[in-house]
């Protein structure tokens, strides 16, 4: 009977704001830096039921500028799985599309299909995601200009440790 009649709460003096679920805070002070990054282009050791292993064309030291050309894949390792917002500063020709595919793990075991791998060893594994092929991805198309562009989609976040980046142009 007591709970059937609403009463005004006079003890709380703050603002009540609408929310659907838990609050999420953007903590730039906890940003992760890459611990390893490499570009791969070709694959070796592929067999009927194995994708093979990536051939690393070049590696990047921490803090150095990274480049990726058409036909190459840049893999960036942040050292631990996290819920995070990717942030990029890059430059490319007008019309170039940069595709970023976050992943929680790399393919291993020579990309053995029997182990559930979806690509060559050393590439980003995405088959474990709810929408592996079209979901959890960023596509950025460059406009005209010769300046670097900063891209920081702060209204969303992803769970990942690795990021696979490809480009349609230089």
Indicate residue ranges for each PLM-predicted region.
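Extracellular/oxidizing-compartment recognition motifs
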Residues: 1-170
């Amino acid at each position: 009977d007591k709970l059937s009649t609403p009463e005004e709460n006079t003890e709380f003096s703050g603002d009540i704001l609408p929310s659907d679920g838990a609050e999420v805070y953007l903590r730039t002070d906890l940003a992760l830096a890459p611990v390893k990054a490499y570009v791969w282009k070709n694959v070796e050791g592929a067999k009927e039921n194995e994708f093979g292993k990536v051939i690393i064309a070049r590696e990047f030291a921490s803090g150095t500028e990274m480049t990726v050309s058409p036909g190459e894949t840049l893999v960036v390792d942040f050292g631990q799985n996290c819920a995070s917002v990717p942030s990029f500063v890059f430059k490319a020709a007008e019309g170039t599309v940069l595709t970023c595919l976050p992943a929680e793990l790399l393919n291993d075991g020579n990309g053995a299909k029997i182990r559930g791998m979806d690509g060559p060893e050393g590439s980003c594994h995405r088959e474990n995601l709810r929408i592996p092929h079209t979901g959890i991805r960023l596509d950025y198309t460059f406009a005209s200009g010769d300046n670097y562009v900063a891209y920081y989609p702060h209204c969303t976040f992803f769970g990942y440790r690795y990021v696979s980046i490809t480009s349609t142009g230089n």
